[in-house]
Structure formats: C-alpha cells, structure tokens
C-alpha cells in the first residue's frame, strides 16, 4: 500500500489510507508519496498504529519493527505488545519483556506499566510483586492512568507494597478523573465499602454511573445492584432491570442472571418466565453458578419451561461442581428422594456434608434427619441432635424445631420440656408453622411453660393460616371445645375440613365426628363414614376402632361382625 505524508515538514501526518482533502493535523492540502526512506521512527509508529487499527497485523509488526530498530521507545513498546498478543508474529513473552524493558528504560510510561504487569503475573519473567509495583510507580509518576490504577490495586491488596487503602483511593481518583474506566469502577467500590475513605454510597453510584456511560458491563451491573437495593438512590426496580439488561446484552453473566430474576418474578419488568429461562440459560452456559442453580430450579418446578428432572439434575450438578452450597443441598435432596436420579442416601450425605462445610444450616439439618432415620447411615439420635444443634444455633428454624422435638421427647438428649419450648419459640418467632404448632401444644398443656390457652390458640391460628394441617386440627379442637377462645362449632368444623383435606388423619377423624354428631355441620352419617374410613386408611387407631363399632352396631348398614372384627384387629 502506498504511503503519503503531509507536505508540511513540521507536520508528521503519514498514512497508507486514501489521501484526505485536508491534513487532519495541520490543515494542509498537499501530500507527497513516500517510499519510506524519508520517514523517521515516529512515522513508522504512526503507520503501525494505523495498520493495527485496520487489523493488518503483519504490516503493523513490520512498521513497529522499523521504529524499534531506530531505538524509538514507542516503537519498542508496540513491538513488545505484538509479541505479547501474537499479532503479526508468534507469541513470545520473553521477547515482549525484552522490548518493554528497553522502552521502559527510556521512560516510556506504557512500557513501564506493561513491564510491571509482566512482573506481577510472571509473564516472561519470574513473578515479582515488588518489581511490579516499582514499575507501576514509575509510570504513575508520569500520570499514566492505567499505571495509576494498577498501582492503586497494589496498595488496595498489599501486593508488592504495604497495604494502604487511602493511597489507593488517591490513585484511583487520579486515574478515574483521567477517564480510565476500571479505576472508576474500583473507586466506586472503595466508596461503597468505605475502604480508604468514608463510606459514601452516593459517590459510589456516581462513579459506577460514569463507568456505565462507557458501556462497562460490570459497572452497568453494579448500577443495577445499587438501584435494586437502594444504595445511593431510592429503590427503583425498573431502573435496576434496565441496567441489568444493558449489561446482559454485553454477555455479562451475573447481569444475565439478575435480569432473568427480574423476568421470573416480574420485578421492574413485565413477568415473563419463559424469557427468564432463556437468560438463565445464557448465564449458565457461561458458567455462572447462581444461574445454573436457578435454571435447575426452573426445570425442577416447570417454571417457564416444561418440567424436566434430567435438565434439573444436569444444572444442579454443574452448580454443585462449583461448590455452590444451595446447589449441593438441592442435588443432595434429589439423591435422598430419588428424584431424577437413582435414590442414594449415601451420595446425598456426601453432598450435604460439602454444603454444611460451607456453613449452610439447611444441609446440617438434612444430615441430622438422615441420622434420625438411619437412612444411609447407622441410626444415631445423639449424632442427629449434634447436627440439629449446629443448624439451630445458626438460626435455621426447621432445625430449631427439630431440636425442640428431641428435647420434648428425650431423643438423643435428656428430656427437657423447658428447653423444648425455648427452641420451639426461636423457630416460631421466625414464622415457622410447625414450631408455632408445637409451641402452641406446650402452652395448651403447660409443657415447659406456664399453661396459657389463649396463647396456644394464637399460635395454632398462626400456623393454621399458613396451611399446616395439624395446627388446623388443633385450632378446630380448641374452637369446638372453647379452649382459649369462644366455642364456635361452625368455625371448628371448617378448620377440621381444612385439616382433613390437607391429609391429616386426626383432622379427618374429627371432621367425621362433626358429621356423625351434627357439630357445626348438618348431620350426615354417610360423610362421617367416608371420613372415618379415610382416617383409618391413614393408620389412625381411633378411626379403625370407630369403624369397628359402626359395623358392629350396624350404623352404616346391616351389622357386619366380620368387618367389625377386622377393624378392631387393625
């Protein structure tokens, strides 16, 4: 390609492109062709930069090589970069370092920074954090924005220098003010965390916003986080979703996952679960563990996609391979239940242990349950209690309830109803329905606490309104008998109905009694018999006995001594 340069001897504009009407540097209108003999090193650097921008890497390498041969520092640096990236030449870190060192010795700031990077990461030279910081410092003295940012990172982390967050903030600020986007991002984080400066969410958001204006994916994502959580601005779900989408379109996996959550839940956008699955999939395929987990849940539950245990197991396994605690837990549950995989409680235990080792209380609780039942492990109440206690002390409500039950019935510990009530209370305070019901039982009968029937009813109601069948039955009984509340047969029958339809055998029995006696409902012996039979099939002895009486007395048709005897025997 033919070379032309500006006729003006003071102007060094040179190009292989089509000759412009006017020189972009001096405004001159005349250009001269060149065979290269009249060009100086700086001209070859300019031509190399032009060739590199055009993607003509072979030409760029040749141009930079000419400049470097004349000892031009910029040419040496750019030739070193070609060796680093393998553009126009075979990639070679040692050659890159050699050229960076030559240029750095002449004071070229870019080369000094590049050489520092090589030392920091051991590219072409032995790793040497102190040498890295020293070269970053040389370049930073010349106000090179990238070097200022790199040196700031060293001061942030104490890499090659003593940690000095305040100095880091100073350097990030200089670099950010010069327009270096990574420095803007890092400075925002320092303000957000209050490291090296007073915590200032407004300043953090301002710097993230400036970086986001340059389409920096991570900064866009962080803006989304700030608007979602109300850091430095009022909570704005719609604006958060906009930032997530912009970052997601740049293929930033965490943003893809967060935008998917917005779509799945309808937070800040119109709910669209199938589209959420598409975004989860994009992030999951990039290896984002949280997205892999969320995608697995979608496949397990059939949310936004047809239910598929195979895909659920695949994505739980992918996230578990990255040691995501919740994925380890859910995959363990699949193995424990045989959902989508062959039932394998031993494998479940291994997965639960990996999750528990990362501090996941729910996993400790599952381990406790395996030992309680002797499922895949030798049955051991003391071991079960130990795991329940670890999870309970971490504030996990189901484990607190389980530990309370162990104390109430003396399983793995000495029976202690007061301790039982304490642990039930901790779980009940978190709104855990089973614990509310158990604590209600304690108050109804004065077990471990002073008898307080109104408090019992209050707790039963809280659990019953969450749909717990046992609590619905207990509330129905209190309402029927006027225990801790005014007697109300109709309300009692309604609570028994809910309990019975929820599959609780005692609720079925009590509902049958209502129909037998006309308590709160119209007397109906046929319905009474149906509910007694359902309760009996669930294994409730009282229902079996009642059916025996009915068949013996002929309440449900002709007397049938054989049927009566069969139910009595059961």
Where are these regions (language model features)?
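Residues immediately within or flanking Cys/His clusters that coordinate Zn2+
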Residues: 3-8, 20-21
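Short helix-capping/linker turns of helical repeat alpha-solenoids
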Residues: 39, 69-73, 85-87, 92, ...
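Short linker/helix segments within small regulatory modules
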Residues: 14-22
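Cys/His-coordinated zinc-binding microdomains
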Residues: 7-15, 27
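Hydrophobic face of amphipathic alpha-helices that form TPR/SEL1-like repeat modules
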Residues: 44-51, 78-85, 114-121, 150-157, ...
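Short Cys/His-rich micro-motifs in 6-15 aa windows
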Residues: 27-36
